[in-house]
């Protein structure tokens, strides 16, 4: 939540923390799950870091972090992992880092509020949040197969499919 009691989706918190880590550790790897893709990749690229995607889940995130010596890993579900904390999840470290980031923001400019740090991200990369459906009369694999068959035909056949963690369709 920000100072206005507005709930912040995990993707924006991961973006804020990725920027904080890359400010201190330029060019380091940041690991994130596929639900965080657009905002997180943008923040990491702008800060000069190495964007590294992983399947969702702590065991996958930690493994990819170790393989890439990543300084930080974040999930949409608000789980945050830290190299300097033996790749463990912590709920306390993120809010301490956000407080540190906010306190440093006033050193060379007017102090920023958390809402100001995320407003630009929200405007650039709005998200719906997770949407779940109950399927009646059809199986999830059948739906995924139909989507996999159909989506590449859109946008002049420029869509690409990613099956890292479920099915993602990327449009250029």
Briefly describe each language-model feature range:
Residues 25-172:
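Phosphate-binding and adjacent anionic-ligand microenvironments
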Residues 19-23:
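A short, N-terminal amphipathic alpha-helix
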Residues 14-16:
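Extended, compositionally biased non-globular segments that define protein topology
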Residues 1-12, 40-41:
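Short Gly/Thr/Asp-enriched flexible loops that form oxyanion-binding sites at enzyme active sites
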